[in-house]
Amino acid sequence: MILSPARTRIKICGLTRPGDVDVAVAAGADAIGLVFYPRSPRHVSLALASDLARRLPPFVTPVGLFVNASPEDVERACEQIPNLLLQFHGDETPAQCEASGRPYLRAARMDPGFDLLNFARSYTSAQAILLDAHVEGYGGGGKVFDWSLIPSDVPRPVVLSGGLNPANVTDGVLRVRPWAVDVSSGVESAKGIKDAVLMRQFCEAVRDADARSIDASSGY
């Protein structure tokens, strides 16, 4: 892995309500995910996504999640949310991911037969590779995958996703040392409805992992 940050970035995905956005930001999220996949229970319209993105303070990034969307749909989202970071979660080719000229994340669906190194080398223009569980359909389904499948020399920054929650994210950060972590169902009371307590606990657990990592590297 090319980067092991002193502070692990946090993305909370699948936000649908203004109040949840405010709590996520206050808890310490560095990014919020807006789902543009119509089949997702966390799907938001472009109008709502724009409203949610406008609530964000400086240096908190809106991320738009797309699954095999048309170039026109991606372009409309970029026009409405000028600072949108793209996240492709379907079968998009490198050329399709690069078509808008915007920075993007590329999701990888992890299973024992998946060649992550070859996949990452195919998406050299990606800002990072987001690692999720391989389940039927798209998205990780709130499932944790085997973290031992992650090679130590992934040639892009890694975002760890897939079944993370306040109880396991500390271990995930310490074991994988990703650039960022991404959570959705692990901080929800219902699909698309975030739980304020769980969001705070998740962010605190990530910071605890960072502190432990610093202590370990310092010899304390």
Swiss-Prot record:
Keyword flag Ion transport: no
Reaction(s) this enzyme catalyzes, per UniProt: N-(5-phospho-beta-D-ribosyl)anthranilate = 1-(2-carboxyphenylamino)-1-deoxy-D-ribulose 5-phosphate
A Pfam family recorded for this sequence: PRAI
Enzyme class: isomerase
EC number: 5.3.1.24
Gene3D superfamilies, per the entry: Aldolase class I
Full protein name: N-(5'-phosphoribosyl)anthranilate isomerase
Annotated source species: Leptothrix cholodnii (strain ATCC 51168 / LMG 8142 / SP-6) (Leptothrix discophora (strain SP-6))
Source lineage: Bacteria, Pseudomonadati, Pseudomonadota, Betaproteobacteria, Burkholderiales
